[in-house]
């Protein structure tokens, strides 16, 4: 045997643990799952509500010992992207010639972040396109609307099923935040579809409504949110609005976007929360109001249908129907017993459906479907995720 071979043999012997009679063989400790998250909507500061459900999901995954790196507008400059304020849709509409460069810079940024990742988690179908070019197993989440734009998940499934089939066909798992989105995804031929709602923070206590009774709306002031119908249906009523957007002139007394603490206070004060959307992938505002024990009046559309059980957790009205919207609001304002009953039912439903513990557990099951079986068993043995669906 050569000298080099002897040296190699010695080094190997020194690093191998000595077997001890009666002691079980030591197994290597599995490394935490590494996930690169790509999203075009993410909070840039504490009071920014853009994509907050994504940042909350990231926090919960990290609490489960998942290593997560996020690529989002807030960190684009770190990756040398050409993002320039106002949102991606705004950038592309104002300067369409930057679209190819912007797309390539996103791909490059995600490739860099995902270099050591086991999995990529892309949000929205547009994010799935970027994930396709990273050479990693990926999961894509469909959220629904993107300010009613041409990249809206519902619109893409309906208008371009072939494109959607191509994107989702390469995904190891498809997460949809509502059954309506799940049906839209399946209609294109998508497989491995998981319907997992957005997680919602559940307040410990419920605060009684304020006097005089307030009708509350919060969110983007844009056509797909039913702002025109909201303004018409609430004429002469005590409407409180938090939000901003292109239809701000229809609700000139809006408080604008407020801090999280102020938003919580507004939920607590509300007698009725209104969600008059024309299109809605999930309905974060609706779910948050329900978590606060507030009765909601919501459009019977999209993800809102999966949250509100008419007459049990709120009242549903046809989307765009101003007369029905007004009637439902007035019915609740005139019946405190009904408000209390619907509010209690709403809170119980959201606790069952949307607690972050449950949503994170189910997300990890979707990740489980996307990674190699050997890693699944090692991670499950280490207690990093459950082996079986409950």
Regions found by a protein language model. Name each.
Residues 295-298, 308:
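Short hydrophobic beta-strand element within catalytic cores of glycosyltransferases
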Residues 278:
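Aromatic "clamp/platform" in nucleotide-sugar-dependent glycosyltransferases that forms part
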Residues 180, 199:
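Carbohydrate-associated surface elements
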Residues 36, 207-225, 231-240:
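Conserved donor-binding/catalytic core segment of Leloir-type glycosyltransferases
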Residues 168, 258, 265-270:
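Short alpha-helical donor nucleotide-sugar binding micro-motif in glycosyltransferases
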Residues 122-127:
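Short His-centered aromatic/hydrophobic patch
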Residues 111, 157-173:
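Membrane-proximal helix-turn-helix segments that form the acceptor-binding/catalytic region
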Residues 310-311, 315-322, 331-336:
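Conserved acidic donor-binding segment of nucleotide-sugar-dependent glycosyltransferases
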């Amino acid at each position: 045997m050569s000298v080099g071979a002897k040296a190699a043999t010695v080094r190997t012997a020194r690093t191998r643990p000595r077997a001890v009679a009666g002691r079980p063989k030591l197994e290597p400790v599995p490394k935490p799952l590494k996930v690169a998250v790509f999203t075009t909507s993410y909070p840039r500061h504490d009071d920014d509500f853009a994509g907050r459900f994504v940042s909350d999901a990231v926090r919960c995954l990290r609490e489960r010992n998942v290593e997560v790196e996020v690529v989002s507008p807030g960190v684009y400059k770190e990756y040398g992207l050409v993002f320039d304020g106002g949102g991606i849709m705004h950038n592309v509409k104002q300067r369409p010639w930057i679209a190819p460069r912007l797309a390539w810079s996103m791909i490059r940024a995600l490739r860099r972040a995902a270099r050591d990742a086991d999995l990529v988690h892309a949000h929205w179908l547009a994010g799935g396109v970027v994930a396709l070019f990273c050479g990693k197993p990926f999961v894509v989440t469909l959220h629904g609307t993107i300010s009613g734009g041409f990249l809206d998940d519902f619109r893409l499934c309906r208008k371009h099923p072939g494109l959607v089939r191509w994107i989702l066909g390469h995904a190891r798992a498809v997460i949809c935040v509502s059954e309506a989105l799940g049906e839209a995804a399946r209609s294109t031929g998508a497989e491995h579809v998981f319907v997992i709602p957005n997680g919602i923070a559940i307040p410990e206590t419920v605060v009684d409504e304020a006097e005089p009774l307030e009708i509350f709306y919060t969110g983007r002031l844009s056509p797909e949110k039913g702002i025109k119908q909201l303004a018409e249906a609430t004429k002469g009523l005590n409407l409180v609005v938090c939000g901003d957007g292109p239809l701000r002139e229809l609700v000139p007394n809006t408080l604008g976007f407020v801090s999280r603490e102020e938003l919580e206070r507004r939920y607590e004060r509300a007698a009725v929360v209104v969600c008059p959307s024309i299109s809605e992938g999930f309905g974060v505002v609706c779910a948050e109001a329900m978590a606060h024990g507030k009765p909601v009046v919501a459009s019977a559309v999209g993800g809102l249908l999966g949250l509100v059980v008419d007459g049990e957790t709120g009242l549903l009205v046809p989307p765009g129907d101003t007369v029905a919207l007004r009637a439902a609001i007035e019915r609740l304002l005139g019946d405190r017993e009904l408000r209390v009953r619907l509010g209690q039912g709403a809170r119980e439903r959201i606790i069952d459906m949307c607690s972050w513990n449950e949503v994170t557990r189910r997300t990890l099951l979707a990740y489980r479907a996307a990674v190699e079986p050997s890693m699944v068993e090692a991670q499950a043995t280490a207690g990093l995720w459950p082996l079986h669906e409950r």
